[in-house]
Amino acid sequence: ISFVLVPLYTYYLTTKEYGQVDLVTTTVSLMIPIVSGGISVAVLRFALDKEVDKKSVVTNATVIALIGILLTAVCYPLLAATKAFDKILLAFLFLLAFQVFTQIIAQFARGNGQVRVFAFNGMIKTLAIGLLNIYFLVVLKMGLNGYLISLILAEIVSLIYLTITTPYFKDFSVKLISKSFMKEMLWFSIPTIPNDVLWWFVNSASRYFILYFLGVSANGIYAVANKIPSIISMMQSVFSQAWQISLVEE
């Protein structure tokens, strides 16, 4: 839908604003596996394992994610001092936190056999982003802030849907917190972080070179042009997600 809405973005956002938004979303995608310890991968793997208690998976994955988010929040003054994402740093942190949890719960849904829920969640989030973009950009004319708010609210909509349709938070139990199981999950997930980071570097690092040499506005133009090849990447991700489940099950 981001491809379909490109005319909307280019009309209501300046190239500089769109460049800033693109840098925020790109950096969030890099930070998710680092902040969460790549735990969503472990959630899928252990949730698919019939010999593992899913409640333990939910509980310990949530604790790991919360620790990562809290540590990131503690770094807020330091990040603010560097003027990274000046004036939109708080939105960046909120978007990061919500995406960490939506990703974890979505992977739990897949591992729990709720593939339809996983698929519908993607569609609901996409629809929410589209409608909220139109509301905040066209109706309220809030520009950059409106775009970021729409992304955060779309993540909240996704979280609400996943909370209603999966037993994730119902399965959470403080009694099941286990350091040994958290270590086991992290032992599986942490080695996947370099892979995620390197794929991110291949696909997204060019934006930072453009930012450094040409500025934010040039990155906005690049981000718009990049929507076309992103469609091919999206099609590839469908097969990749199906392969992940088959790999664990077999």
For every predicted segment, state its role.
Residues I1, L23-V24, V28-A80, I88:
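Membrane-water interface segments that mark the loop-to-transmembrane alpha-helix transition
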Residues T10-Q20, L78-L90, N112-V117, T126-I160, ...:
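Membrane-interface helix-loop junctions in multi-pass transport and translocation proteins
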Residues V35-E51, P229-E250:
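Helix-loop junctions and terminal segments of transmembrane helices
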Residues L90, R116, L140, L144-L148, ...:
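Interhelical loop/hinge segments that connect adjacent transmembrane helices in multipass membrane
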Residues F3, P7, I34-G37, A73-A81, ...:
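Membrane-embedded alpha-helical segments of multi-pass transporters/permeases
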Residues T25-P33, W199, Y222-Q241:
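Transmembrane helix-bundle signature of multi-pass secondary active exporters and lipid flippases
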Residues I1-S40, L95, T126-G130, I134, ...:
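Signature of the first transmembrane helix
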Residues R45-E51, Q99-M123:
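Membrane-interface junctions at transmembrane-helix termini in multi-pass inner-membrane proteins
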